[in-house]
Amino acid sequence: MDFIKEQYNSLVLDLRKTFRNKRDGLSHILNVICLLLNALMIWKLLVVFTGCESPVVVVLSGSMEPGYYRGDTLALYHPPKIHAGDVVVYQINGRDIPIVHRILSLHTSKDNKFHLLSKGDNNNIDDRGLYDPHQYWLENEHVLGLSVGYTPYIGILTIWINEYPVVKWAIVSIMLIMILMGYE
């Protein structure tokens, strides 16, 4: 218990020293704002260069194993044409979470629209059960992007943050303390 009190008192003392001078406090706040704006600019550049609304996604389920595992981070690109066998990320109307699956087959309708059927590599049946009740095919507007690369397991932190709120609050608390103490 004494250790916690010592750490708390040390933190309060450091915060008082940091914000005693108004210029230093303002400098810390401006540095944080610049950091956030830089991250936003990088994200927007990725959106422009890849043509995808979400150029980076995390695999949330095991439906694509052994190719992609839960927590893998995928880099996406919006190609002009999709082929059977491509791994795509798509989003169905009314669902918030995008799905990462492979294109099983595709065909062109009479009005020259592409229709796609998807399936997870680890699933026994195609994805028609996931689509809207009277929808049998995906269309191009459902596809968010084509997987062009991945980084294994780096997205597991995202999954933990969403599944365990304690992890989210711990990370946010640590970041706030580091920002306020002047660690940039």
From Swiss-Prot:
The active site is at 63 (charge relay system), 101 (charge relay system), 127 (charge relay system). SUPFAM superfamilies: LexA/Signal peptidase. Residues 170-181 are annotated as: C-terminal short (CTS) helix. It comes from Plasmodium falciparum (isolate 3D7). This is Signal peptidase complex catalytic subunit SEC11. It is found in: Endoplasmic reticulum membrane. Component of the signal peptidase complex (SPC) composed of a catalytic subunit SEC11/SPC21 and three accessory subunits SPC25, SPC3/SPC22, SPC1/SPC12. Within the complex, interacts with SPC25. The complex induces a local thinning of the ER membrane which is used to measure the length of the signal peptide (SP) h-region of protein substrates. This ensures the selectivity of the complex towards h-regions shorter than 18-20 amino acids. The complex interacts with the SEC61 channel-forming translocon complex and is involved in the import of classical signal sequence-containing proteins. It is a single-pass type II membrane protein. One of its GO terms (cellular component) is signal peptidase complex. The keyword Phosphoprotein applies. Its main location: endoplasmic reticulum. The gene is SEC11. GO terms for biological process: signal peptide processing. CDD domains: S26_SPase_I (cd06530). The chain crosses the membrane at residues 29-49. It catalyses: Cleavage of hydrophobic, N-terminal signal or leader sequences from secreted and periplasmic proteins. Residues 50-184 are lumenal. Residues 1-28 are cytoplasmic. Phosphorylation increases catalytic activity. Ca(2+) slightly increases catalytic activity in vitro. Belongs to the peptidase S26B family. Disruption phenotype: Causes a reduction in parasite growth in the host erythrocyte. Reduces levels of the mature form of SERA5 but not of PEXEL-containing proteins. Its EC number is 3.4.21.89. Catalytic component of the signal peptidase complex (SPC) which catalyzes the cleavage of N-terminal signal sequences from nascent proteins as they are translocated into the lumen of the endoplasmic reticulum. Specifically cleaves N-terminal signal peptides that contain a hydrophobic alpha-helix (h-region) shorter than 18-20 amino acids. It comes from the Eukaryota. The C-terminal short (CTS) helix is essential for catalytic activity. It may be accommodated as a transmembrane helix in the thinned membrane environment of the complex, similarly to the signal peptide in the complex substrates.
